[in-house]
Regions:
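Terminal membrane-proximal soluble interaction domains of membrane-associated proteins
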Residues: 2-88
């Protein structure tokens, strides 16, 4: 299971986007989820908790950000500027 991918989660029928961490790429062995679903952990600011959401793969987009950077920014409620990473 790939659990180190930072993603943008798009909420259907809105312009809301969240940053989350893929915690489970496949839910096939869990019969109550559709096959295209993935598990994404969405941390809350100040690390008081977070939500694990099960969402269709089509609603997530991987981004070039480390888990450490995503968690740090979440902890600080995205108040600090992040360094832009350019593709080579």
């Amino acid at each position: 299971q790939k659990s180190n991918q930072v993603v943008i989660v798009t909420i259907p029928e809105s312009k809301i986007q969240l940053v989350g961490l893929v915690t489970r790429e496949s839910l096939e062995e869990l019969p109550y989820f559709e096959s295209e679903m993935v598990a994404v952990y969405v941390p809350m600011s100040y690390m008081v908790g977070g939500y694990t959401i099960f969402i269709p793969r089509s609603l997530i987009r991987p981004i070039n950000m480390s888990v450490e950077e995503a968690m740090k920014n979440s902890l600080l409620a995205w108040l600090t500027k992040t360094e832009k990473k350019r593709k080579p």
